[in-house]
A protein has these predicted regions:
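Conserved alpha/beta enzyme-core scaffold
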Residues: 12-228
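Low-complexity, intrinsically disordered or signal/transmembrane-proximal segments
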Residues: 5, 10-11
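Conserved small/polar residues in nucleotide/adenosyl-binding loops
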Residues: 1-5, 162
Length: 228
């Protein structure tokens, strides 16, 4: 991962606190949060969001984690209006609020969810997929026939804010993820108007080998680094 430091003077990303990051998330916003059952999630920022009391959020997430972990804390606190998600089974708060009508759930198969986020980041009009044909996933969606085969048109997803969790970053905002903590983070970094990365370790620009970077700093607006 590491290489010899460069002496080139690069643009430095602004470091902010978790509370400052949470303050950029306003009531009613659409927010992407990286993570897979909490792995790779920006936990300090999520804690700050819980403290802030922000509400009526729409979350775009792979899963709703657990009531006491990851984005599930926001659902447990009833700060979320809608979730676009592939799995909710590990968080009973999600299903309880769904069944009571307090929380709107838009289920999306995991691979399709990833492609919709990727499409949003790439500026595409959507993605064609056979996944979900003939199921409730297809309800209300356009079916397009290509060479005699039907596909669902899944529209792109974008967010007001993306909150990422990274293992390592340099001061230019280049991000590295350890193992499966990568999950949805790199895709989400491309598909939001404002991107904030919470990083476990911060190094000087030039300390990360270019081939190790999974999210280039050009996508990152702010970083939340561990307190020293």
């Amino acid at each position: 991962v590491y290489k010899r430091q460069s002496k080139i003077n690069h643009h430095m990303k602004k470091l902010i606190s978790a509370a400052e990051a949470a303050g950029m998330v306003k009531d009613g916003m659409t927010v992407m949060i990286g993570g897979f059952l909490g792995n790779g999630s920006p936990h300090a920022i999520i804690d700050a969001l819980v403290e802030s009391g922000v509400k009526d959020l729409t979350l775009i997430v792979n899963d709703t984690a657990y009531p006491d972990k990851g984005c599930g804390r926001l659902i447990a606190g009833k700060q979320v209006r809608k979730v676009i998600v592939s799995h909710i089974g590990t968080n009973p708060c999600t299903s309880e609020q769904m069944n009571s009508g307090e929380l709107e759930i838009e289920f999306c198969p995991q691979g399709t969810l990833a492609e919709r986020v990727r499409s949003g980041g790439a500026g595409l009009g959507g993605v064609l997929t056979p996944v979900g044909l003939g199921t409730i996933v297809a309800e209300g969606k356009q079916i397009i026939n290509v060479d005699g085969k039907d596909y669902l048109l899944e529209k792109p997803l974008r967010a007001d804010v993306a909150l990422l969790g990274a293992s390592l970053a340099d001061r230019s905002g280049n991000l590295v993820y350890k193992g499966t903590s990568q999950n949805f983070n790199p895709l989400m970094a491309t598909a939001a108007d404002l991107v904030i990365a919470e990083v476990r370790e911060l190094v000087e620009t030039g300390a990360i080998a270019p081939e190790a970077v999974r999210t280039p700093g050009i996508f990152v607006d702010y970083m939340v680094a561990p307190a020293k």
